[in-house]
Amino acid sequence: MSAHITFNKNLANIEGSLIRTLDAEMQKIPDMVRLTLGQPDFNTPRHIKNRAIEALEKNLTTYTPSQGTPDLLNAASHFMKEKYDVTYDPNTDILTTNGATEALTASLLAIINPGDKVLIPSPFFTLYESIVEMAGGVPVFIDTVKTEFMLKPESIHEAMTEHDNVVGIVLNFPNNPTGVTWTEDECKQIADALRKYPQLCVISDEIYSEFVYTGKHVSIGRFLKDQSVVINGLSKSHAMTGWRIGFTFAPAHITREIMKVHQNVVTNVNSIAQYAATFAMSDGIDDADPMREEYRTRRDIFCNALTELGFKIAEPNGAFYIFAKIPDGSNQDSMAFVLDLAKQAQVAVVPGIAFGAAGEGYIRLSYAASIEMIEKAIERISGYMKGGVTHEQSSIQ
């Protein structure tokens, strides 16, 4: 008799990551310029790697407290105060997680009951929708296209009027995929709007906080600490995507609930990574500075070139992505455009539809790539847009 296994119904409509699926296909094609993943092309700073070696030599290879090592929690608290002027008690308000993804997952699982609704400004990083649905919740999207990808207070009020049983909202700034972020005044306006709904848990994904090009990042925690979970980590700021170090920063009563999920799913984060991360957030508190300047240069080169080719761009002031509107004359949806660009010019980008229906008609390009690769991409995209094939056609279907 064959097995007849049933699965969680919440998974029925959840697909694998379109971004990663496309990237895996693109990797198979020789000489493809890949501008797909949000993967820094810098190496983890040497001093951090040395600390990981030191941890191994000290045999720091056992379980740690589920919340994180005391030294790391203290370093994280200092980092948030020094960088963003928000105070979190390392003993009660901070949780170390397996990257920002686990921080998001544990936070949403902690607040959602079956049928609860969560607001998600759109376009959005696709995991937000998937996690809400896995938790049995219902995502409610707020279209930001008409406001140049900026969430507005009136949009929050409108969504709260139209929907009942809304328990949370997921914010993301600097934003993936658009690169748009908020000034201090804009952040305060959003906080003031959300404060009118004390039942809302505000989950603020601020993983790109160290990459703001004009002004400085302002955390929602400065204005709305009592009802916010701020999510951050070292994947982007310290080029540590594989180390899986993330955090939640929230009031103690919220942190306790998130901790229940974390402890029962993960136990604790890798001990060696935690040791190295302690020094990343102390000795390496400004490690992102040279990366930021390099990203700024790349952004400017890429934005200028794409604009000249007819793409419309909401200028990205943060993260390392460009969200470009496909020129009207292409007569292709975003998926068709991306597949044709890969086939004809061997440049891999992400279709806007991967970030929700509001992303249709756009493509996301990552400038977490060398200037040499960006210039090669510009040359190939230029040839493609002008109707010529600049490179040998690939076999992509």
Spans of model-derived segments:
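PLP-dependent class I/II
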Residues: 1-7, 12-13, 25-29, 33, ...
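Conserved N-terminal alpha-helix of the aminotransferase class I/II PLP-enzyme fold
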Residues: 63-97
